[in-house]
Amino acid sequence: PAKTFNVAGFRTAAWFTHNEEIYRRMMNQQTYKKGMGRNIFGNVALMACYNHGDDYADQCVAYLNETKNQAVAYINENIPKIHAVNPEATFMIWLDCRGLGFKTQKELKDFMFKDAKVLLNDGTTFGEKEGNGFMRFNFAAPRPVVMEGLKRIKEAADRL
């Protein structure tokens, strides 16, 4: 529930298996890796999330969907040199930035960071060839922050 309920610091991860071998291996890992164990705060947080978090999760998903829709529309309507792919199952928008005309991925990353003043995920993380010319934009943030980032990208792209 770490991402769904924004409780990453509570160590609330859980795993389930019917496979005896996987169970044995996971238990062995927990014995040697202190970071894998939960504490009382994590246990309470986990139970609270699963027992009382439905409304929060529903509201969060609705908010993120609206933010995603606004962000994708803004990019595709206002930044003609960038195309946004509407994600179906993640909070990252895949940006096709090849229309900006940069020759290297480094130039694209520098443009986003130095000119647009935004820090995006590098598309080449998903393959040097396949991700070249692409960036990922995280929209799992307050909507005004997301829109400010997109405005900065637009203004920087308009200056090219």
Where would I find each of the regions flagged by the language model?
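Short, solvent-exposed loop/turn elements at beta->coil junctions and helix N-caps
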Residues: 1-2, 81-82, 123-127
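Conserved core segment of the aminotransferase class I/II
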Residues: 1-65, 155-157
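A short beta-turn/loop motif at secondary-structure boundaries
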Residues: 5, 85-88, 127-131
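Short amphipathic alpha-helical segments
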Residues: 10-11, 60, 89-91, 133-135
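Residue-level recognition of strand-loop junctions within catalytic nucleotide-signaling folds
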Residues: 18, 51, 96-98, 140-142
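Conserved glycine-rich beta-strand-loop-beta hairpin in the small C-terminal domain of fold type I
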Residues: 47, 63-72, 84-97
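PLP-dependent enzyme catalytic core of the Aspartate aminotransferase-like
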Residues: 103, 111-120, 126-160
